[in-house]
Amino acid sequence: MNYTKFDVKNWVRREHFEFYRHRLPCGFSLTSKIDITTLKKSLDDSAYKFYPVMIYLIAQAVNQFDELRMAIKDDELIVWDSVDPQFTVFHQETETFSALSCPYSSDIDQFMVNYLSVMERYKSDTKLFPQGVTPENHLNISALPWVNFDSFNLNVANFTDYFAPIITMAKYQQEGDRLLLPLSVQVHHAVCDGFHVARFINRLQELCNSKLK
């Protein structure tokens, strides 16, 4: 879990950071529809399943932007060298979910090895956090594959210094000749503005339009 201390003093967003961290601590969410038409077609001849592929692509996009890898450590702002996805797994028998994490790798084959290893070990464990303590360097990914939504928001009480992005996918649906996936991104306003979330979403769309390798 390597990281770099961030130079807040000379940051162009210093005023924004301090205002939304101390004077008006808040977050916001933004929902957009990701076109997954090309991605789904490419998976027809692949051994990879859609959900872990989306976890991989989301993690890949998040890891390209400093503002999505920021955290407070020892009361200082830092940027993790990389963040690992923490994702939800639904248990049909109990109608509950667990949150699992696996090491991120930019190589999709290695990432899938990591993902499958975690799933094989913990997929039947119904505790909320089967692996115990969540890694400090993480992002959050979950899915609601039962419903298509236009917006999604987590109402967080007593908003504090939790800067990890929270990304939620809905049920995808056909619209004309396109397959669209609603995706909600929730962030802390101290480290992210609408511009940064839009940049992440646009990058994720580019990744979904590209070949996996």
Curated annotation (Swiss-Prot):
Top enzyme category: transferase
Active site: 189
GO BP annotations listed: response to antibiotic
Swiss-Prot/TrEMBL catalytic activity: chloramphenicol + acetyl-CoA = chloramphenicol 3-acetate + CoA
InterPro entries given in the database record: CAT-like_dom_sf, Chloramphenicol_AcTrfase_AS, Cmp_AcTrfase
Ranges annotated as spanning the membrane: none
UniProt xrefs under Gene3D superfamilies: Chloramphenicol acetyltransferase-like domain (3.30.559.10)
EC number, UniProt record: 2.3.1.28
GO molecular function, one term: chloramphenicol O-acetyltransferase activity
Keyword Mitochondrion recorded: no
Pfam families per UniProt: CAT (PF00302)
Keywords for this protein: Acyltransferase, Antibiotic resistance, Plasmid, Transferase
Range of residues in the leader sequence: none
Subunit architecture: Homotrimer.
Known function: This enzyme is an effector of chloramphenicol resistance in bacteria.
Family: Belongs to the chloramphenicol acetyltransferase family.
Protein name: Chloramphenicol acetyltransferase 3
Record organism: Escherichia coli
Species classification: Bacteria, Pseudomonadati, Pseudomonadota, Gammaproteobacteria, Enterobacterales
Gene: cat3
